[in-house]
Amino acid sequence: MKSIVFVALFGLALLAVVCSASEDAHKELLKEVVRAMVVDKTDAVQAEERECRWYLGECSQDGDCCKHLQCHSNYEWCIWDGTFSK
């Protein structure tokens, strides 16, 4: 009878350790996924900052805007410059 109780308690302890390890692995996986999402967003923001400003994007001079756009003097955003060429 004592051995059955010992085996049952040992089994429960082993199950608790396995579940705890599984939960830790799940938390680590979740942290990695969230970290990857945050890194992707910061990379996207940096890429946008390196490129030219699109239509109605904030600017301080014409060189900030993309091709066929110019910086509006009053509102400081990129607007169409009136050209059609490629």
UniProtKB/Swiss-Prot annotation:
Expressed by the venom gland. It comes from the Eukaryota. Residues 22-50 form a propeptide. Coiled coil: none annotated. It is found in: Secreted. GO terms for molecular function: ion channel inhibitor activity; toxin activity. It holds the Pfam family Toxin_12. The presence of a 'disulfide through disulfide knot' structurally defines this protein as a knottin. Ion channel inhibitor. Belongs to the neurotoxin 10 (Hwtx-1) family. 17 (Hntx-9) subfamily. This is Omega-theraphotoxin-Hhn1d. It comes from Cyriopagopus hainanus.
